[in-house]
């Protein structure tokens, strides 16, 4: 079900602490995937959020609906931040094939520094553990799968 793209839709990807939340600050609408997952599983615990691989269909449907609602509200630039699975990207591209894909590249050392500096309450484990969770490794598959469609930004 392809949607007419009157508005700019950008999907922003990157590993943990790559700056997804602060990139495209000027967007008219930012849709944060972890907020959607929190709503689905009723938790903000990092372990629970990272154990969401089985929710890809539900997350994809919710994202498509949220993009549609934002576009109907005349939001010119809609940013989706933090998709972690290829199957979700595929679903969005089926509906919005002209969406721009942006990968934020940041060296591991810088991501670790950011992780340790932010002292977020949800960060209950070491950077090394968080960075090697199944959901983070799935994120790397996005890079591998969509390499030719990605705009790669050095975000450091």
Task: Set out the residue ranges of the language-model regions.
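ATP-dependent small-molecule kinase phosphotransfer cores
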Residues: 30-79, 83-90, 123-125
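P-loop (Walker A) phosphate-binding loop of NTP-binding proteins
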Residues: 15
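Conserved phosphate-donor/acceptor-positioning beta-strand/loop module used by diverse small-molecule
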Residues: 81-83, 94-118
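Small-molecule kinase domains that catalyze NTP-dependent phosphoryl transfer to phosphate-bearing small molecules
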Residues: 116-156
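Extreme N-terminal, non-catalytic leader segments
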Residues: 1-8
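Walker A/P-loop
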Residues: 21
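ATP-binding Walker
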Residues: 18
């Amino acid at each position: 079900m392809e949607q007419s793209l009157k508005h700019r839709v950008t999907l922003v990807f990157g590993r943990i602490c790559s700056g997804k939340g602060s990139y495209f600050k000027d967007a008219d609408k930012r849709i944060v995937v972890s907020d959607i997952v929190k709503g689905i599983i009723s938790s903000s615990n990092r372990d629970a959020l990272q154990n969401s691989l089985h929710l890809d269909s539900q997350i994809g449907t919710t994202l498509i609906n949220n993009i549609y609602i934002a576009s109907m509200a005349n939001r010119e630039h809609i940013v989706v931040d933090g998709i972690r699975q290829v199957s979700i990207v595929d679903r969005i591209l089926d509906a919005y094939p002209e969406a721009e894909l942006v990968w934020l590249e940041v060296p591991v050392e810088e991501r670790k520094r950011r992780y340790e500096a932010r002292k977020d309450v949800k960060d209950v484990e070491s950077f090394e553990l968080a960075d090697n969770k199944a959901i983070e490794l799935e994120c790397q598959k996005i890079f591998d799968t969509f390499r030719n469609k990605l705009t790669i930004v050095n975000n450091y």
